[in-house]
Structures are given as C-alpha cells and as structure tokens.
From Swiss-Prot:
It is found in: Cytoplasm. Pfam families: Cytidylate_kin (PF02224). The gene is cmk. The keyword ATP-binding applies. It comes from the Bacteria. One of its GO terms (molecular function) is dCMP kinase activity. InterPro entries: Cytidylate_kin, Cytidylate_kinase_dom, P-loop_NTPase. GO terms for cellular component: cytosol. Its EC number is 2.7.4.25. It is an enzyme of class 2 (transferase). Its main location: cytoplasm. It catalyses: CMP + ATP = CDP + ADP; dCMP + ATP = dCDP + ADP. ATP binds at residues 11-19. This is Cytidylate kinase. It comes from Bacillus thuringiensis (strain Al Hakam).
Length: 225
C-alpha cells in the first residue's frame, strides 16, 4: 500500500462523516482533515469578536487573521485557533447552529478551499465535508457520499450533546438538522451534493464499524488496480 491516495467523504450534518473518516485515516496511517472544524473555527472566532456573520466583508477580516492547525491528540484530533486549543468550544450548539451561515459566503469558502487543497496536495489524506468530492478534491481516488435519515442524525447528535454535557432537545435537533440540510443544499457556492462518481452509502441502520469496513473494501479495490 505504498500508493498515497486521497479519500473524500461528503454528506449532510451528523451523518457520521467525521467519526468514520477518523477511523479510516487511522487504519491507513493517513492524515485526517476535518473541513467542518475549519468552518466551525471561523464561526467561533467571529462570534467571539461579535462580528455580523451575515456580513461577508467583516467575516473575511476574521478569516485573514485566523491560523487553523490540526494536531493528533491521544484519541482525537485537536483543533487550534492561533495557538489556542478550541477543539471543544467549536462543538457547542451556539457554533453548530451558525456554521452553515458562515459557510455560505463565497469568499470564505474560496479561502477555506484553498487552505484545504494545500493540506491535501501530497495525498495520503482522508477529508470530510460537504463539497470535498465535488469541489475541494475533485480528483480524489475514492469518493463517498454518506446519508442517514434526519431522525437518525438527530438521535446521534442528541447522544453526542448529552455525552458532552450540553443541553439537548431531540425535537429541536430534528428541526435544526433539517434547516442545516436546506441551507447547505441551497447555497449558491459549493452546495451539498453528491459527486457524479461518488459511491452513496446510507448509514441509517449501520454501525460505525460496518461503515468503515465498507469504505476500507472500496479503498482496497483502488489499491488493487
């Protein structure tokens, strides 16, 4: 397995992309790049600076002054904003409910995509997001589009919130996830959509292990060519 390929995993909010991507990256000894965490970090920085997240010009001032770095922690990936560990604070509901608004801005996405492509240029990466297979890594050797029902995704996020000690309301989460789907799918710039050459994977009734096995099977097929 000397060949270092790029693996793109796309899908809607709470489809399990990050969880699966981390495991796949670990199995292959690849770098995992969580593009969602990059947008979350920008969102967190903007909220901290009391910036109007609907205002692209103000947001770009934030983006210009933000350095985002990833480091591998013991069991997780750590995210740093200008040297400060923000791994936990970028996962709060306040950030989660606003990240799609920040991500819809053309100039913000262009800059983030540029940074993501830079991180992935040597291959050996697993990258997850909304537009990886269509826009960020259109030449990725493996493209997966993960799906799951709104109900299933809300339940996963609810459990995640409870485990982290956040207040969580299942019905409210269903509404918020449906709203994020709408925002992500309908935005003008790089909307959430399946790449023509991506393999669709419905994870509604599958465990993480089963999803990982399916993806590793696809990767093995690429290595065998």
């Amino acid at each position: 397995m000397d060949k270092r390929i790029s693996i793109a995993i796309d899908g809607p909010a709470a489809a399990g992309k990050s969880t699966v991507a981390k495991v796949v990256a670990k199995k292959l000894s690849y770098v995992y790049i969580d593009t969602g965490a990059m947008y979350r970090t920008i969102t967190y920085a903007a909220l901290e600076q009391k910036v109007d997240i609907e205002n692209e010009e103000q947001l770009m001032e934030v983006v210009k002054n933000v350095k985002i770095e990833f480091q591998q922690g013991e069991n997780t990936q750590l995210v740093f904003l200008n040297g400060q560990d923000v791994s936990e604070v970028i996962r709060t509901p306040e950030v989660t409910n606003r990240v799609s608004i920040v991500a819809k801005h053309r100039l913000v996405r262009e800059e983030m995509v540029r940074r993501q492509q830079e991180l992935a240029e040597k291959g050996g990466v697993v990258m997850d997001g909304r537009d990886i297979g269509t826009h960020v890594l259109p030449d990725a050797e493996v493209k997966i589009f993960m799906l799951a029902s709104v109900e299933e995704r809300a339940e996963r996020r609810h459990l995640e919130n409870m485990n982290k000690g956040f207040d969580s309301n299942l019905e409210q989460l269903k509404e918020e996830i449906a709203q994020r789907d709408k925002l992500d799918s309908e935005r003008e710039v790089s909307p959430l959509k399946k790449a023509d050459d991506a393999l669709e994977l419905d994870t509604t009734s599958l465990s993480i292990e089963e999803v990982v096995q399916k993806i590793m099977g696809i990767v093995s097929g690429v290595f065998a060519k």
